[in-house]
């Protein structure tokens, strides 16, 4: 009999699914799910049943998942940062090249003269050659806003291509900053970065502080010959202001992976249909990483790369493992251990980690526990979820 069940939405690479099945987990959309695995599916609250312990996004963005609701129910939400970073980076580099050489404008102009007589066609080709003179990217400056997995890879590639790189990331960790190439020049503000850049590439997550972050203020600093690249999230750019700058030719190109119908006819917009992570390698990497997360979480309660829970690992030293999700308030651990002591349950080892208002505990016990113990724990004010994960 299968121990846990995983429900999938979207097409998930078989490499990730096989990893899940290999350890005895089932993948059945008709059964109650203990874990949900998805890509771009917009998950509704109604689809999250009481049996769900974790939701796993095979990709980086999690704005298609109701995270606040999940947190309130003690449900961990995971993503796979970095698994598709190389795929997105390659499309960004391609976009820098095609925009600097006017590739699409030149191609579209060729289509218009295809029916001309041969001699006239050759003349027009030479005229187009003069019309679409491009620029080389060597020696040009790219400003990168957001220096996470993707932004740092873009920076490395641009440096290797001879570009000057300016970076800005107000929330970068010390550890991540140490990993950045030393050639990156740090901007003191996004305004300074925009003013100095020939290309501006956005690599930020979407949240309340980044929505419309590229606003009228930043657009007012942009060079009319600059190229703005958005491979992060559509809502990061204020499209009302963008529309004005595009139609008044105050921006050379806007290149994006998030097409808008109103911009498709503009010759200074290059749109792709969400191709950033759409490579077989990226999809496989995301599925494999998600599979590994599901296995560790369902079988051992361990967490890595969660957006709402702290990374928490504890080497299993007992067949009787308990996990507890609670509000991050004083004396919660004391109340948990008091209940276990009341029932004569000894703690072999444990770890307690917190993230914001939430705390997560893994406890290895010296003996098994019954429903009476679990009910006593879940009835503690401030505890949102309790799981008993025996390994017998």
Where on the chain are the PLM-derived regions?
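Phosphate-binding beta-alpha-beta segment of Rossmann-like dinucleotide-binding domains, i.e.
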Residues: 81-141, 305-307
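Hydrophobic/small residue at the entry helix of a nucleotide-binding pocket
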Residues: 150
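Rossmann-like dinucleotide-binding domain for NAD(H)/NADP(H)
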Residues: 220, 224-316, 327, 360, ...
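A conserved regulatory-domain signal marking ACT and ACT-like small-molecule sensing domains
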Residues: 304, 308-392
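Rossmann-like adenosine-cofactor binding region
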Residues: 44-46, 170-263, 278
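An N-terminal-biased, well-structured beta-alpha scaffold segment characteristic
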Residues: 1-81, 195, 215, 238-240, ...
